[in-house]
Curated annotation (Swiss-Prot):
It comes from Penicillium brevicompactum. SUPFAM superfamilies: S-adenosyl-L-methionine-dependent methyltransferases, Winged helix' DNA-binding domain. One of its GO terms (biological process) is mycophenolic acid biosynthetic process. Belongs to the class I-like SAM-binding methyltransferase superfamily. Cation-independent O-methyltransferase family. Pfam families: Methyltransf_2. This is O-methyltransferase mpaG'. O-methyltransferase; part of the gene cluster that mediates the biosynthesis of mycophenolic acid (MPA), the first isolated antibiotic natural product in the world obtained from a culture of Penicillium brevicompactum in 1893. MpaG' catalyzes the 5-O-methylation of three precursors in MPA biosynthesis including demethylmycophenolic acid (DMMPA), 4-farnesyl-3,5-dihydroxy-6-methylphthalide (FDHMP), and an intermediate containing three fewer carbon atoms compared to FDHMP (FDHMP-3C) with different catalytic efficiencies. It catalyses: (4E,8E)-10-(4,6-dihydroxy-7-methyl-3-oxo-1,3-dihydro-2-benzofuran-5-yl)-4,8-dimethyldeca-4,8-dienoate + S-adenosyl-L-methionine = (4E,8E)-10-(4-hydroxy-6-methoxy-7-methyl-3-oxo-1,3-dihydro-2-benzofuran-5-yl)-4,8-dimethyldeca-4,8-dienoate + S-adenosyl-L-homocysteine + H(+); 4-farnesyl-3,5-dihydroxy-6-methylphthalide + S-adenosyl-L-methionine = 4-farnesyl-3,5-dihydroxy-6-methoxylphthalide + S-adenosyl-L-homocysteine + H(+); 6-O-desmethylmycophenolate + S-adenosyl-L-methionine = mycophenolate + S-adenosyl-L-homocysteine + H(+). (4E,8E)-10-(4,6-dihydroxy-7-methyl-3-oxo-1,3-dihydro-2-benzofuran-5-yl)-4,8-dimethyldeca-4,8-dienoate binds at S144, Y199, R265, Q267, S303.
Amino acid sequence: MSAASPASIIQELASAAKQYENNESGAREALIAQSRALIASLEVPSEFIQHTFWSQPALSAIVRLATDVNLFQYLKDAQEEGLNAEALASKTGMDVSLFARLARHLVAMNVITSRNGVFYGTALSNGLAAENYQQSIRFCHDVSRPSFGAFPSFFKGNGYKTPALGTTDGPFQSAHKVDISFPQWLVGNPPYLQYFNSYMSAYRAGKPNWCDNGFYPVADRLLNGFDASVSDVLLVDVGGGRGHDIATFGSQFSPLPGRLVLQDREQVINSIPADESRQFEATTHDIFTTQPVKHARAYYMHSVPHGFGDEDAVKIMANLVPALAKGYSRVLLNEIVVDEERPVMSATNMDLIMLAHMGAKERTEADWRSILTRAGLKVVNIYSYPGVAESLIEAELA
């Protein structure tokens, strides 16, 4: 099937614009996607090459440099008054000529604006001034970008084969000249471990949660039909880290008809600050052992099988099976489900991040169905939200 014509894409843009004005969910994401599609339909190969190999790499490098000299913070602090090249060059420690050349590219790429020799921050650049985004930029430029750059030489050298899961011989190792796994490297490079954690936090920032209105129908699928005589536990967050997701769930649906239980490794649970106001219980659990909480209404996992190979993913899911009450308990997986027909960039981005750094992958719907079937479960439904890479897979006993 041929690509959409510019005229048809413009019609889609107009429709998405009306939805955006009405504050409809997914409209912003649709506008971005259609805008990119319009550019792709209009660009000629020479423009594509310049954009891909000149404009974007230069932008990445300048944005990374900006984190070292606090450029976005200075522009944010200047607010509507802005700052001229001389003032910004002085603040950032650059010579005026160099600053002006770099800043002009930021203007050309719509990151900042300029008028009558004065530079101004934008909503985008002001957002990038936040520390979590500054650290995310450092991780993406210093760690991920070289790993992607190693793709051509690495895959040519290995005969174009997928690296083994958890590899110590992949694009990341090739780019950074190391022979240890990506997680081991992070532990040995504490600043980048912090940058990586900030990146993961920023990756999810501002995106709808699985339990938000319009995503997964919590009231219909969990709250309605809850039976305390079967179990007084409403939700178990398996491998839930320090409790971000389960705390969000509790705050959105308080008062709750049943208990909330967070499970993770001992060192993670012990790192959670004491808080008498929290609505969940925190307990230790190894996901490779049988689930100890029986007959809860739902068992929730957010990106838990995600980092494991298929065999381990099957074991993790199978360990839930003895705890489930047939026809009552639900298994909820908050995971990326890669659409094979119409993949979205947020999903393919993360899939390639996994390939570059760990030899892992994001799974398709067929992949998830296969894993759950092998574990003794069946998919009831897959819920998605417009513009969000992660879906909510609901499963139950087969």
